[in-house]
Swiss-Prot record:
Gene3D superfamilies: 6.10.140.1730. InterPro entries: Ribosomal_eL29 (IPR002673). Residues 15-31 have a biased composition (Basic residues). It comes from Arabidopsis thaliana (Mouse-ear cress). Keywords: Ribonucleoprotein, Ribosomal protein. Belongs to the eukaryotic ribosomal protein eL29 family. Transmembrane segments: none annotated. GO terms for molecular function: structural constituent of ribosome. It comes from the Eukaryota. Residues 1-61 are annotated as: Disordered. This is Large ribosomal subunit protein eL29y. The lineage of its organism: Eukaryota, Viridiplantae, Streptophyta, Embryophyta, Tracheophyta.
């Protein structure tokens, strides 16, 4: 008896495009769970010290 076929990609592309291949929805705040703690700590400091130039203009005078 002949061996049976194990795999084929036939019709898979058509099935995927039937409802359209969509990009994942972008959220305003992406979850940080499981991310590198060193990177997250640096992000926190960067966010804390991210000051626009116009906000502290009156302090120097």
């Amino acid at each position: 008896m002949a061996k049976s076929k194990n795999h084929t990609a036939h019709n898979q592309s058509a099935k995927a495009h039937k409802n359209g291949i969509k990009k994942p929805r972008r959220h305003r705040h992406t979850p940080t769970r499981g991310m590198d703690p060193k990177f997250l700590r640096n992000q926190r400091y960067a966010r804390k010290h991210n000051v626009k130039s116009g906000e502290n203009a009156g302090v120097e005078e």
